[in-house]
Regions:
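Structural motif
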Residues: 345-355
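Bacterial Sec-dependent N-terminal signal peptides
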Residues: 1-13
Length: 381
């Protein structure tokens, strides 16, 4: 009897804990913890009753960079996880098959650690670009009632299709780390997925261009910076009579979005319009690096749904959906130095005694005693 009461008490406590866990998770992320399984629901486009069904929603067979491809199709599609009215999910394996009812497993962003370079960017840069695309792309539920003749529906359809195009471009290698477009060369372009006769072509391209510009600006650093410290340009600080100083001008128009720090002490920064003034009262002993860090940089978090296989035509199509915003610290780099000159002095004397004479040289950052030699000469470097 005591044992039965104890079991009931434990059950009640566990039920309460589980209930609290359910309520605590409402509204925090789009999906549950990593490892959850869910089914794919694919919505064909155009929908029945769409008056813009002109036969231009599909495309011919396409072969993309890095072995990715698409079979010839007469329609298009969107998809969601869990139901036909679930949050939208986007394909990340062009050409790999997928059907409604296919079951995929949720993974976090570590999924991209297992992806190699696509020849343009690394797996990690693919992850970052997709998160930034989702920041400006369509994030919401889909609906089987969408019709392209309805303006609101057409807007959501166009936004979603443009988002998918940019994600595909990132996957196959048509976008670099700064989100600039790279020509596919002899391969088909992802944009060939959309015929110019598509009833939403103009709207899709408007979103495509706007989102592309937004992602590029999202990652743009001041023009005097590079994204790699190894390739950073070296600028020179010059003495102005009271301090060592230089002024850097940003032609990218993003200076106000960045804060600056140096890997040595004693460096002061100030902004004036599109100009950054860097100064020091004491000359640095060696070249140093300045880091520009974007303030309040965020992007969408990524949820990956996968069958554990990632290669063209292998297994079931993997997809990504969105979660809450995460930090996205975009950084740029620039280097600084002070060029030191040398001073050569020749001692003269009526009595000819010019060697072994000591002098003390003082000045900004200099306090040194030297001794003449070799005909009254000394050089201070």
């Amino acid at each position: 009897m005591v044992k039965t009461k104890f079991k009931r008490a434990v059950s009640l406590v566990m039920a309460a804990v589980l209930s609290l866990g359910v309520f605590a998770n409402i509204g925090t992320t789009a999906y549950a913890a990593s490892g959850t399984k869910s089914d794919v629901y694919i919505m064909q486009l155009p929908r029945s009753g769409d008056t813009n069904n002109n036969g231009k929603w599909g495309h011919g067979e396409l072969k993309f960079m890095n072995g990715w491809y698409s079979h010839a199709i007469s329609t298009d599609s969107l998809r969601a996880m869990g139901s036909y009215s679930g949050n939208i999910a986007y394909c990340i394996e062009p050409g790999t098959g997928q059907h409604t009812g296919d079951t995929l497993t949720e993974k976090n962003e570590d999924y991209f650690n297992n992806l190699g370079s696509n020849g343009t960017i690394s797996g990690d840069d693919i992850r970052l670009n997709i998160g930034r695309i989702l920041q400006y792309g369509y994030c919401g539920s889909i609906s089987t009632s969408w019709k392209s003749q309805n303006s609101d529906d057409a807007d959501k359809l166009s936004h979603a299709i443009a988002t998918q195009l940019l994600i595909w471009e990132t996957i196959v290698g048509e976008r670099d780390e700064s989100f600039n477009h790279k020509s596919p060369g002899s391969y088909d372009a992802i944009l060939d997925h959309i015929q110019k006769g598509h009833p939403l072509y103009s709207r899709i391209m408007a979103y495509y261009n706007s989102m592309s510009e937004s992602v590029q600006k999202h990652t743009k650093v001041p023009s005097f910076c590079t994204k790699s410290s190894g390739s950073a340009k070296v600028n020179e600080l010059k003495w102005d009579g009271s301090k060592y100083v230089t002024t850097l001008t940003d032609s990218n128009g993003v200076l106000g979005n960045y804060e600056f720090s140096a890997n040595i002490d004693g460096v002061t920064f100030s902004k004036s319009g599109n100009k950054l003034i860097v100064s020091m009262t004491k000359a640095p002993s060696k070249e140093f690096t300045i880091t520009a860090t974007k303030t309040n940089g965020t992007r969408k978090g990524i949820v990956v749904w996968t069958d554990g296989k990632n290669s063209p035509g292998n297994g079931i199509q993997d997809v990504v959906s969105y979660s809450q915003n995460v930090s996205d610290p975009v950084k740029g780099f620039v280097k600084m130095k002070v060029s030191y000159g040398s001073c050569k002095i020749v001692k003269t004397s009526e009595d000819g005694k010019v060697d072994g004479i000591k002098f003390t040289i003082t000045g900004n950052g200099v306090n040194q005693t030297v001794t003449t030699a070799n005909g009254g000469k000394f050089q201070l470097d």
